[in-house]
């Protein structure tokens, strides 16, 4: 009889053992992200990541400067946390998101953004929307970063911005890496994304750049119209007469006389800001604004610009001041600047398209033309990018 009773007993014991191990494994899996859940609640869920990798884009959008660092949901999620984490500054007061606010198309309304210990940025903070969709791979106004990956950790190491400069007694980036390594939620996030807890500058760059490249806006009035026509030059059926006029003025090159005065054609904006991405031409010189934001002298090296998409917010107002100095606050003033270019002494890098026949261009604009271009620029504003939670601050 013993063999008969022994087998069921062993069988039941085996089942209980397996079930016990299974429960232990499940509990371990749940507890492995306890720090993430404690810090972020439902805003970051490793089991249900936001969609960054396959958002899609219109068929007419062809430019892409990703260059091998393709977006994944996991790395972009980690990039989002890094982007908004004030722990990335020396005194835990400033994050990337402090100077690039979602409600302003990831730009800033301040002329110079506030850094650590009352430091100020040397140039106005550039909007980040659609940074991926450009032939220009370099970043910063002066293009000093060869890639977005390189750009992402330079503000962290800037003495005035986030402070890990290694200058005047300040800590270096290696101190930050150790600091992050000791935060429980980063231990879990890096383990989740990379399979280990090692934190390096290249990993910060990889994740931050993926998050920034994921920020896209293609639900504007312009996009609705562009999807209905075969070519950019055709009238958009959803545009007003004024908006279509402004589009034509934007796209058409101007005709100049020998003195550089416009006698016909459009404004030629698309020569540097080509549709449909409205990104900056990589071969562009500066635009004639050569002042410094908070220092004397001139700076002729600002040849980069953000996309003109979402230049204006959903309220019809600019998403902060324009140009590297932040010195232009209205679309009227921006168009006025290009309407009459002054050839300043020492500006050897002025874009040649702005000095026809050796003269600073005079577009000879009338108010109807200005109003039409303004109306067109406002059609480039999307909506979802301002409120989509996958780009929002996960710490709030």
Q: Residue spans of the language-model regions?
A:
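Glycine/proline-centered hinge or cleavage motifs at structural transition points of membrane proteins
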Residues: 138-181
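Bacterial N-terminal signal peptides that target proteins for export
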Residues: 1-10
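C-terminal capping alpha-helices of c-type cytochrome domains
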Residues: 173-192, 196-219, 327-396
């Amino acid at each position: 009889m013993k063999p008969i009773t022994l087998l069921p007993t062993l069988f039941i014991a085996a089942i209980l053992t397996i079930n016990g191990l299974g429960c232990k494994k499940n509990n371990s899996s749940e507890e492995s992200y306890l720090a993430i859940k404690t810090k972020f609640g439902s805003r970051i869920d490793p089991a249900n990541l936001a969609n960054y990798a396959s958002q899609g884009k219109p068929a007419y959008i062809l430019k892409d400067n990703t260059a091998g660092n393709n977006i994944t949901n996991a790395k972009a999620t980690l990039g989002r946390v890094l982007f908004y984490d004030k722990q990335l500054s020396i005194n835990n007061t400033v994050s990337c998101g402090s100077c690039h606010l979602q409600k302003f198309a990831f730009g800033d309304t301040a002329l110079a953004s506030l850094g650590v210990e009352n430091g100020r940025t040397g140039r106005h903070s550039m909007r980040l929307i659609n940074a991926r969709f450009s032939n220009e791979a370099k970043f910063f106004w002066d293009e000093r970063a060869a890639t977005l990956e390189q750009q992402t950790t330079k503000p962290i190491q800037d003495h005035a911005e986030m402070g890990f400069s290694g200058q005047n007694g300040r800590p270096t980036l290696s101190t930050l890496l150790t600091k992050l390594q000791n935060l429980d939620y980063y231990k879990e996030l890096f383990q989740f994304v990379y399979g280990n807890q090692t934190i390096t500058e290249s990993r910060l760059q990889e994740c931050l750049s993926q998050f920034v490249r994921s920020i896209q806006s293609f639900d504007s009035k312009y996009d609705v119209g562009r999807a209905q026509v075969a070519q950019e030059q055709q009238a958009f059926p959803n545009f007003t007469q004024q908006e279509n006029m402004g589009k034509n003025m934007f796209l058409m090159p101007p005709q100049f006389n020998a003195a550089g005065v416009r006698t016909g054609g459009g404004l030629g904006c698309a020569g540097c800001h080509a549709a449909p991405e409205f990104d900056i031409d990589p071969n562009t010189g500066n635009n004639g604004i050569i002042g410094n934001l908070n220092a004397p002298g001139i700076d002729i090296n600002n040849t980069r610009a953000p996309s003109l998409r979402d230049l204006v917010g959903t309220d019809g107002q600019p998403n902060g001041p324009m140009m590297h100095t932040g010195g232009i606050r209205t679309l009227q003033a921006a168009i006025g600047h290009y309407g009459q270019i002054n050839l300043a002494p020492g500006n050897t890098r002025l874009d040649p398209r702005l000095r026809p026949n050796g003269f600073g261009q005079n577009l000879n604009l009338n108010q109807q033309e200005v109003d039409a271009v303004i109306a067109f620029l406002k059609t480039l504003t999307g909506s979802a990018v301002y409120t989509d939670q996958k780009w929002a601050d996960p710490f709030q």
